[in-house]
Amino acid sequence: MNYKITSDSTCDLSCEQAERYSIGILPLYVQLGDRTYQDGVDIFPDDIYQHITAGGALATTAAVNLSDYVRAFSALSRKYDFVIHICISQEFSCCYQNACLAAAEYENVYVVDSRNLSTGHGLVVLEAVRCAEEGMEPSRIVEHLQECTAHVDASFILSRLDYMQKGGRCSSVAVLGANLLKLRPAIEVKDGRMGVCKKYRGTFEACVKAYIKDRLQGKTQLDLRRVFITHSGVPDEIIETAKAAVLSYQNFEEICVTRAGCTVSSHCGPGTIGVLFLYER
């Protein structure tokens, strides 16, 4: 069957991955100053960082709107036998709600809530591609993806909290304490929501090593086909440290290093890195 897999830009897959697997990307919106941009189209995380460093206000993000989904689904539904669109968790955005409303007009368009964000979302997108390539019926793919969302392990560790403070997600007292004690919080996604899972103390490099050890050491029943190391802008040596740590605990076939897009980066700021992978069903 002729098919198309699409996703919100929050999947944080690289341009190369999207091109390789013919994944259609629908961008979220980013409000920066008095202008509105499209994530990954005419604005990128470093643009946001430069704006804020220059004294500008924190960027805000908005969902893919209903008309964008209708326009995309209308064109794709005529061209392909079926279309499957995977959204960022509905706990983080109204993308899923908007996509469902748009898809209701087309019998061959299906929408799945990834229950995740960033490459936790991206892992579900790539699983959709795999299923479609194997010739699964669309209804079975949707069912499989809904089961798959519970098997995504998505987490990040932050080196700084100033963006979280500016966004009202932590207090200035908490930021001061974290800076004084060199605390680096790790955040994980559970049931479609984010929460702090552990706080690490020390240099960021040491904390990254400890964080990856906690996520991977001694873990069984992992899907070893692929792991993502996704970051919002960290030094190359931190990425190399993360790659070495991952391989010291698990023998993944592929390590994908990707940059987080504007949605994640505008909330956490630079200096965030995570490992994201699947458990076997």
Where are these regions (language model features)?
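Short, contiguous strand/loop micro-motifs
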Residues: 1, 59-60, 86, 161, ...
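Mixed-charge interfacial surface used for oligomerization/domain docking
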Residues: 4, 10-24, 28-29, 35, ...
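Class I S-adenosyl-L-methionine
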Residues: 36-105
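Short beta->alpha junction loops
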Residues: 63, 114-115
